């Protein structure tokens, strides 16, 4: 799913989500606060740099196989005892294809997978 605005507080599961664009608020690219699980998601864009995280601003639970590009220097602004598996796509050592492979490994028990799209960013598609 592509969402136009991040989630404020996640208490459930966000799986295979992508967000692109510019956020002018102090927030995270996917969610402001994570109390649940975020799995195989990515963000690419511009965040207000101070007190922002590319995936979430505040993490209290689990982030698995998530990736980000853009100006953010960190995947999580503040981690409060949660587990974080989030990687920056820098275009040199980590490319978007690396992100696709990592996110697909985390996607289990569903009919979808990430593929590299024509624009160079991951797109979600039904498994063949």
What would you call each of these model-derived segments?
Residues 1-128:
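Predominantly extracellular beta-rich ligand-binding scaffolds that present long acidic/polar faces
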